[in-house]
Curated annotation (Swiss-Prot):
Residue numbers binding ATP: K10, F58, R86, T92, R103, N113
Enzyme class: transferase
GO biological process: CTP biosynthetic process; GTP biosynthetic process; UTP biosynthetic process
Reactions accelerated catalytically: a 2'-deoxyribonucleoside 5'-diphosphate + ATP = a 2'-deoxyribonucleoside 5'-triphosphate + ADP; a ribonucleoside 5'-diphosphate + ATP = a ribonucleoside 5'-triphosphate + ADP
GO terms, molecular function: ATP binding; metal ion binding; nucleoside diphosphate kinase activity
Top-level taxon: Bacteria
The protein's name in its UniProt record: Nucleoside diphosphate kinase
Protein keywords: ATP-binding, Cytoplasm, Kinase, Magnesium, Metal-binding, Nucleotide metabolism, Nucleotide-binding, Phosphoprotein, Transferase
Active site per the UniProt annotation: H116
Amino acid sequence: MVERTFSIIKPDAVERNLQGEVLAMIQGAGLKVVAMKMIHLTKAQAEGFYAVHRERPFFDSLTTYMCSGPVVCSVLEGENAISRYREIMGATNPANAAEGTIRKKYAVSLEANSVHGSDAPETAAFEISYFFNALEIVG
């Protein structure tokens, strides 16, 4: 089934200028970039995006980190895009990520793990609409 998912290349990867490498891995896995923008999140934007984690102990640290530098947001499209992108990303904790995944190759730590990706169709829909309107998505 062709579906869309949402991706963020996080501040640690952008700071190291890894956007090209990450996008090459994504496209190499057969996913198509149908929308993309680079932004510097405000604290309020990060808190709104990660609102589902508001009660978690890592919420403040995560939202502060996500505002620490520019990020690259994109909408990816392809067969089983959500599960395929999650496979390419690797485990949240880079120590547990499989060889050849984005997080195994590029993550610095559990928090600075280089990428974010939607985990379900409902979250993909929310996350895509949080950063993009329909006119910004081509495909």
